[in-house]
Structure formats: C-alpha cells, structure tokens
Amino acid sequence: MSDWNPSLYLHFAAERSRPAVELLARVPLENVEYVADLGCGPGNSTALLQQRWPAARITGIDSSPAMVAEARSALPDCLFVEADIRNWQPEQALDLIFANASLQWLPDHYELFPHLVSLLSPLGVLAVQMPDNWLEPTHVLMREVAWEQNYPDRGREPLAGVHAYYDILSEAGCEVDIWRTTYYHQMPSHQAIINWVTATGLRPWLQDLTESEQQHFLTRYHQMLEEQYPLQENGQILLAFPRLFIVARRTE
C-alpha cells in the first residue's frame, strides 16, 4: 500500500482530533507512567496524551514511515516506532493503551482486543475510538462504485458491534464503558467530502488504480455523493460520521 499523506490527513485536524479529546476525557486515570498511542499518525493524539501526563513515558506506534516522521518532528520528546500494531511488544506493562481511529483497519478483533488487554498493567486502561461508518453513504458508495467499475473489494471490514466488543472485553477481565456518537461535520462542498475520505477510507480503493482509473472512480463517486448528501439552506452539507468509543479497564 502507498504511504499515508500526513498533510492531507491533517487538513481536517480539528475534526479528527475532537473524538480523541472526548475519548481521553473518559479515561479514569490520574497518574500513568507508561502509555502507548497505537496508530499515532502525525502525533495529534500523542500531543493530547503528553499534555495530560507530561511526565509519562509515551510511545507512539504507526506502520506509516511518513506519519512516524511527522510525529517525531512535532513531538521530539516522545518515542515513535514504525511497527505493526499486531506485532509490537512493549518493554513493560502499559498503564494506558490509547487507540484513536486505528484499530478499525486491523482484522480479527476477537483476538486483537484480548491481546491488547494482556499488555496492560493491573487496573490499566484500553481506550479505543473507531469510525463506525461502514453503512454510511460515504462508504457504501465506495463499494458501489467499485462494483460498477469492476474493481475488487478493498475496503475494511465492518466493526464487530457494541455487544460483541462488550463481551470480548468483559471476558478478558475488564470493566467496559462503551458508547456511540454521531458527529455532523459541516462540509462546504461534495468535493470536501472526497478530500476527507481520500486521506483515510478511500485510500485502499484508489491505491492500485492508474491515474485515469482514479479520476473515473472519483467522478462517479462525486456524482453519487451529490445524490445522497443534499445541500442545506446555507449551501453547506452535513456529513454524518458515527464513531464507536470503548474504555475498558482491567479489574486486576
């Protein structure tokens, strides 16, 4: 897969950081020593962790060389590691694992989540936020355009669901706080929606296409977005964006 584009990702930095702020506010920890930010991206979520716990030893993990380089430049006091979340092993038990908009890209959550819990110290916390927009028009239309144009399915899998995550984490020995929030982002145009998803959800669909194939895909995608997202009276578009939040704390 081609590398992530930090500049494109940060074009909507405020909107992308807001869920991280709200997730962090629900973490029931006062003092922490060891923290991991899984899928840290360009370091916007890591900066929030550093602000709350300036004395903590924070490690950001991301598989993207470009994202890790951007994060290192922005936060030289933190450690950033280029690694696959599934394979990375901390040197010590973690007081907090923070994963904002990253775990949805990984398969087999029935194994992944218990594995992450096993990396926590006693009473440690796993805090997760994942986009829950697999059934939103933005993502349904990606699949429809790919089907129309005879491209293979390259999108991510849907989330396991609230009840499944509750059971997975409860059985792993955690107290679980889980909720879902839908944000309504004001977009100035349908092209702005494309700019948003091009940095994330649309990447797998476009990565192996030629330039002309990408343009053909995006032209059709734009047409379908216009049908699904009407303009408001002031010309803005409201983009519904559901997100699933989980705060799981080990009971021992």
Curated annotation (Swiss-Prot):
Q: Which family does it belong to?
A: Belongs to the methyltransferase superfamily. Tam family.
Protein name, entry field? Trans-aconitate 2-methyltransferase
Q: Which InterPro entries does the UniProt record give?
A: Methyltransf_25, SAM-dependent_MTases_sf, Trans-aconitate_MeTrfase, Trans_acon_MeTrfase_C
* UniProt subcellular location: Cytoplasm
Q: Which organism is it from?
A: Escherichia coli O17:K52:H18 (strain UMN026 / ExPEC)
Query: What is the primary gene name for this protein?
Result: tam
Instruction: Name the SUPFAM superfamilies on file.
Output: S-adenosyl-L-methionine-dependent methyltransferases
What is the enzyme's class at the highest EC level? transferase
Query: Does this UniProt record's set of keywords contain S-adenosyl-L-methionine?
Result: yes
Classification from the root reads: Bacteria, Pseudomonadati, Pseudomonadota, Gammaproteobacteria, Enterobacterales
Tell me the function of this protein: Catalyzes the S-adenosylmethionine monomethyl esterification of trans-aconitate.
